[in-house]
């Protein structure tokens, strides 16, 4: 069986997150806020999962099925790419905490989270010798 390309898989997670927000979270255009935090949380978790797949492909931090602490990623990334470290720190805060745990209803925060996730995935794609999807 052919192994999935981790960058393609990461981007699939991003699209699933985008689809979840678009179809289920009920955007109020007047307030520029989503109405249902359940779907914002789900989208945040999909998005963070996609980021972790890309990071694992480059840095090989994950061992088996054991959960890896964010500090393990930080220590490995810090040695290789400080800009990526900043993005991962922002991603952890915006995507994992604000979206995934808190279910922040702000569309601006969610849009920024997608931008951060795509930047991280693109940097990982470059490190793997692949073409980035978007460079900001």
Predicted regions and their residues:
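Terminal alpha-helical segments
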Residues: 1-136
């Amino acid at each position: 069986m052919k192994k999935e390309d981790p960058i393609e898989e990461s981007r699939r997670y991003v699209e699933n997150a985008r689809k979840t927000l678009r179809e289920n979270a009920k955007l109020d255009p007047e307030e520029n806020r989503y109405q249902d935090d359940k779907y914002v949380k789900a989208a945040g978790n999909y998005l963070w999962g996609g980021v972790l797949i890309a990071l694992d492909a480059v840095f090989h931090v994950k061992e088996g099925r054991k959960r890896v602490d964010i500090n393990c990623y930080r220590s490995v990334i810090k040695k290789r790419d400080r800009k990526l470290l900043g993005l991962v720190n922002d991603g952890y805060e915006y995507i994992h905490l604000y979206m995934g745990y808190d279910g922040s209803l702000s569309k601006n925060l969610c849009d920024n989270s997608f931008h951060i996730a795509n930047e991280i995935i693109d940097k990982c794609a470059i490190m793997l010798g692949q073409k980035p999807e978007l460079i900001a």
